[in-house]
Swiss-Prot record:
Official protein name in the record: Large ribosomal subunit protein bL17
Gene behind the chain: rplQ
GO biological process, one term: translation
Domain of life: Bacteria
SS bond list: none
Keyword Protease included in the entry's annotation: no
HAMAP family recorded: Ribosomal_bL17
Organism field: Trichlorobacter lovleyi (strain ATCC BAA-1151 / DSM 17278 / SZ) (Geobacter lovleyi)
Lineage: Bacteria, Pseudomonadati, Thermodesulfobacteriota, Desulfuromonadia, Geobacterales
């Protein structure tokens, strides 16, 4: 029985799955939108939201925690200097998943996961 075993295995070993999530979250924060399967998008959403919350915290420990997960220093810098300030007034819900349809080769359900864009302040 699999009671209280949350999360998807995605047909991978634990180390492969964690490495894939790290790579995908790094790409998502770098490009701000990626195309992937529905299941992978739903899984990396929680990790990406946690990284943005670390960025909003902004202290040294949060910076080190984010740097331990995100693979590129430039993306960590972007997270703390560009992405986190954009969401300073938003309490969660930093990403959106849009379903695209099915992939031609294997009919896997594809989705776009992207960072929610904040409306630019209007000048009067």
């Amino acid at each position: 029985m699999r009671h209280n075993n949350s999360g998807r295995r995605l047909g991978r070993t634990t180390s492969h799955r964690i490495a894939m999530f790290r790579n995908m979250v790094t790409s998502l924060l770098n490009h701000e939108r990626i195309v992937t399967t529905d299941a992978k998008a739903k899984e990396i959403r929680s990790v990406a939201e946690k990284m943005i919350t670390l960025g909003k915290r902004g202290d040294l420990h949060a910076h080190r925690q984010a740097a331990a997960y995100i693979r590129e220093k430039s993306v960590v810098t972007k997270l703390f200097s560009t992405i986190a300030p954009r969401y300073k007034d938003r309490a969660g819900g930093y990403t959106r998943i849009i379903k695209l349809g099915q992939r031609l080769g294997d009919a896997a359900s594809l989705s776009v996961i992207e960072l929610v864009e904040e409306a630019a302040p209007q000048q009067s």
